[in-house]
């Protein structure tokens, strides 16, 4: 992983969907990816080796941000 990059990762499958240089772009991509996921499967944004944001699709089709542990 390159320092300073933001990585969009499925926490369920551990697939890496993309890597980008800006948080804004990472947020957009993560929300798009989670919309295509199954309800309850978290999609995370990692930066400098840490999960900084996490999103999940609710059963009613809404994207929600979850607290990062």
Language model: regions and residue ranges:
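A short, charged, amphipathic alpha-helix used as a generic interaction element across diverse proteins
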Residues: 10-11, 20-42
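Short, mixed-charge low-complexity intrinsically disordered segments
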Residues: 36-69
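Surface-exposed loop/edge segments in extracytoplasmic proteins
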Residues: 13-20, 51-53
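Compositionally biased, intrinsically disordered low-complexity regions enriched in proline and serine
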Residues: 7-8, 18, 48, 56
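A general secondary-structure boundary signal
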Residues: 7, 22, 65-67
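Amphipathic alpha-helical interaction segments
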Residues: 14-15, 25, 63
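Short aromatic-glycine-(Arg/Gly/Cys) micro-motifs in beta-strand/loop hairpins
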Residues: 1-16
């Amino acid at each position: 992983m390159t320092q300073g990059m933001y990585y969009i990762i499925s926490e369920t499958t551990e697939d890496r969907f993309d890597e980008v240089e800006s948080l804004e772009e990472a947020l957009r991509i993560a929300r798009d990816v989670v919309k295509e996921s199954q309800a309850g499967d978290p999609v995370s944004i990692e930066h400098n080796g840490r999960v900084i944001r996490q999103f999940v699709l609710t059963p009613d089709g809404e994207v929600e941000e979850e607290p990062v542990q």
